[in-house]
Amino acid sequence: MGKIESNERVILNVGGTRHETYRSTLKTLPGTRLALLASSEPQGDCLTAAGDKLQPLPPPLSPPPRPPPLSPVPSGCFEGGAGNCSSHGGNGGNGGSDHPGGGREFFFDRHPGVFAYVLNYYRTGKLHCPADVCGPLFEEELAFWGIDETDVEPCCWMTYRQHRDAEEALDIFETPDLIGGDPGDDEDLAAKRLGIEDAAGLGGPDGKSGRWRKLQPRMWALFEDPYSSRAARFIAFASLFFILVSITTFCLETHEAFNIVKNKTEPVINGTSPVLQYEIETDPALTYVEGVCVVWFTFEFLVRIVFSPNKLEFIKNLLNIIDFVAILPFYLEVGLSGLSSKAAKDVLGFLRVVRFVRILRIFKLTRHFVGLRVLGHTLRASTNEFLLLIIFLALGVLIFATMIYYAERVGAQPNDPSASEHTQFKNIPIGFWWAVVTMTTLGYGDMYPQTWSGMLVGALCALAGVLTIAMPVPVIVNNFGMYYSLAMAKQKLPRKRKKHIPPAPLASSPTFCKTELNMACNSTQSDTCLGKENRLLEHNRSVLSGDDSTGSEPPLSPPERLPIRRSSTRDKNRRGETCFLLTTGDYTCASDGGIRKGYEKSRSLNNIAGLAGNALRLSPVTSPYNSPCPLRRSRSPIPSIL
């Protein structure tokens, strides 16, 4: 019993922290990296597939002799399914070492703190998220170990989702262009940021397309991004100045001091008394000022639409539509001012009404002030809260308008059946206005109850309004605070031109290799192995098949080979780079093979019946250990860093 228990124990050294558990514990989550590691170890309790049911293989009749050792496999390419698991001394090719305590030890160069939660998931069936670990790091570790993120417990789901909410909020606010670094990369970065790198690449090698490729992003950034250069800041200040002048002019046009009353009375032929007609004209000085502003806005609009990287998106933008609608009436008004027909006067009257669109230019200030952008994003993010507030108000208005109508009719006189003499609430629709004014605590005083029952309803209406409005407001305020803090944090983010790349390993490093292929193989983040493993395949295969007579069990037939569930959601673009101990001719990989990333289906201990799904099937090999279980290996979803 002691020997069986020692063989069942396994030690996992993750980032220098040793964890000890049993193989049966690791097998509780089939299809994950540790389950593949536990299943790949040669043992007498290996499983075989008999139809759709997994059955244990019978124990060997007699202890087989110990086979010759396999050649060591470089770290990062382990046949037992450990990903970048490295062994402490070879022992039967299992990638682990016999520990003095009786277990086998495997090393993973991963985050030790997160692995404690991962291993606890195997033990208890409940996956919790550590509060002191950044969300992307925990997500990356879950992907490496092949665990569904949807298995996170509901109590920790908000903690796990916080980083995604923050990333989505940060993506909303555009950061200024990075300053410094290699000047040769400016054009490529600008083209990539503006989304025109593909179009620029198709321009051809001629000089015209080359000049356009250089000019387009510069001109677009000059009028679109105030932080791209000093000239862009000057353009932004000029645009801001003309916006403020235009709005000021629009407001002053309504003042009596700038309105000139002209007599437009026309003589009436064959008439006795002509009708006096007066028109109000705006001071010509304000008209000239507005004309200068419109000329600037026209120039800015034309430049932006010409150098826009995406004309369709430019036209669909709401601010650009407002800009165009605010510019067009001025030119139509100038063109029709010389006409005296009735139709022209009607059109001019309509255009004067459309002038109010100019006030919407104030929203163009959102390009220059972060607070206004934060306010806009807060309003969009709080749509559900605003909808909830409207529903609450609508319910309250309907209820209290009905109550005030009947409450005021209680004291009506017998000779006044409509109660119109002693109350202003003659019908329920009139009570809607009173209920809205009361619930929003405005209290104009134009309508008020006059009976004791009506006063009681009015008091209840005011209290309900205060409570109703106060409930969604904190959520909206919290959204504004979150967006504003994230916007400030992104503005203060250190400006980096290039991502840090770790240096190549030194000659004294255990992962040092002489070729680039082996460097990728020995990386702690890599599963690609294309180098010297080819020289070990024939040797290992010959060792595994050299003593076929020692095994008491026949090799598995193809239908009986053990399937291993894999998912199509993990790293589809690297299917052809997986490194197995056997060559590609010795196995058949399903078209959707890969460690599942865990975005499609939740998996827990209650809904796992065994290994199912698409299979990775290996050729039958009879082992001297009398166990026909094939060697299996999963690949890491994390690409190589070297």
Swiss-Prot record:
Q: Where is this motif: Selectivity filter?
A: 441-446
The protein's name is Voltage-gated potassium channel KCNC2
PANTHER family attached to this UniProt entry: POTASSIUM VOLTAGE-GATED CHANNEL SUBFAMILY C MEMBER 2 (PTHR11537:SF172), VOLTAGE-GATED POTASSIUM CHANNEL (PTHR11537)
Q: Which GO terms describe its cellular component?
A: apical plasma membrane; axolemma; axon; basolateral plasma membrane; cell body; dendrite; GABA-ergic synapse; membrane
Ranges facing Cytoplasmic side: 1-233, 308-317, 373-385, 478-642
Give the record's free-text account of how this protein's activity is regulated: Inhibited by millimolar levels of tetraethylammonium (TEA). Contrary to other channels, inhibited only by millimolar levels of 4-aminopyridine (4-AP). Inhibited by Stichodactyla helianthus peptide ShK.
Consequences of knocking out this gene? Mice are healthy, grow normally, are fertile and show no evidence of severe sensory or motor abnormalities. Show increased seizure susceptibility and reduced long-range synchronization of gamma oscillations over distance in the neocortex. Thalamocortical neurons show a strong attenuation in maximal peak firing rates, with larger spikes and slower action potential repolarization. Neocortical GABAergic interneurons display broader spikes and sustain lower trains of high-frequency spikes without accommodation or spike doublets in rapid succession.
Q: Where in the cell is it found?
A: Cell membrane; Membrane; Perikaryon; Cell projection, Axon
Show the stretches that span the lipid bilayer.
234-254, 287-307, 318-338, 350-372, 386-406, 457-477
The record's subunit annotation is: Homotetramer and heterotetramer with other channel-forming alpha subunits, such as KCNC1. Interacts with KCNC1. Homotetramer or heterotetramer channel activity is regulated by association with modulating ancillary subunits such as KCNE1, KCNE2 and KCNE3, creating a functionally diverse range of channel complexes. Interacts with KCNE1, KCNE2 and KCNE3.
| Tissue and organ distribution | Weakly expressed in the brain at postnatal age day 7 (P7) and increased at P60. Not detectable in newborn hippocampus. Expressed weakly at P7 in the early developing hippocampus, increasing progressively and reaching a plateau of expression at P14 that is maintained throughout P51. Expressed in paravalbumin- and somatostain-containing inhibitory interneurons of the hippocampus; in the CA1/CA3 stratum oriens-alveus and stratum pyramidale and in cells within the hilus and subgranular layer of the dentate gyrus (DG).
